[in-house]
């Protein structure tokens, strides 16, 4: 089962999402360039029984993929608390509370530090173009020898002290869950 959370916070079926987003209905598509048959999405469906997709994130991913001009490798999408704990135990830089756990994050791997930096720069423009606030995580992963970029559209009240890219935020958002 695929559930899409709209930007208004409403949960809708894949079929309703496809109709709203102009994707062929009854297909495996969750975006113009992404489908449930892709490795990571299929794995999340198998692991959790449900694939949860955030409208803002998929619109961002689609536009970024369109501008990038070649496929993007999704290496992390949804995560359970158990999966997050496994990553921490294994020594990965994994937050206690991650936007991946609330279906608002994606890690895209380019296979190259240089291309990841280029993708992150392109993402800034895409987010601005779409009017979507996005957080970008890159440098700490590059320093650790990774080649992926973390993107999330998680509201700042979930992420104390981690503002959206280039955006200030109200002080009251600092009373939040730490991750």
Where do the PLM segments sit?
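N-terminal start-of-chain detector that recognizes signal peptides
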Residues: 45-47, 77-83, 120-126
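Catalytic cores and adjacent binding grooves of peptidoglycan-active enzymes
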Residues: 94-179
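A short linear-motif detector with a strong N-terminal bias
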Residues: 52-55, 83-89, 127-131
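Extended, low-complexity, intrinsically disordered C-terminal regulatory tails
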Residues: 58-91
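Extracytoplasmic cell-surface/polysaccharide-interacting catalytic and binding patches
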Residues: 1-65, 127, 144, 154-179
């Amino acid at each position: 089962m695929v559930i899409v959370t709209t930007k208004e916070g409403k949960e809708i079926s894949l079929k309703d999402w496809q109709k709203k987003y102009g994707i062929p209905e009854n297909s495996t598509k969750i975006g113009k360039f992404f489908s449930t048959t892709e490795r990571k999405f299929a794995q999340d469906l198998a692991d959790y029984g449900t694939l949860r997709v955030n409208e803002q994130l998929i619109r961002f991913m689609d536009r970024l993929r369109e501008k990038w001009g070649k496929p993007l490798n999704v290496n992390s999408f949804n995560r359970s608390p158990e999966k997050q704990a496994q990553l921490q135990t294994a020594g990965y830089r994994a937050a206690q509370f991650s936007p991946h756990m609330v279906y608002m994050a994606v890690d895209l791997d380019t296979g190259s530090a240089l291309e990841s930096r280029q993708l992150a720069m392109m993402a800034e423009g895409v987010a601005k173009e779409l009017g979507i606030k996005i957080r970008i995580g890159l440098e700490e992963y590059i320093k650790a020898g990774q080649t992926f970029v973390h993107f999330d559209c998680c509201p700042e009240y979930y992420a104390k002290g981690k503002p959206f890219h280039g955006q200030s935020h109200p002080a009251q958002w600092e009373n939040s869950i730490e991750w």
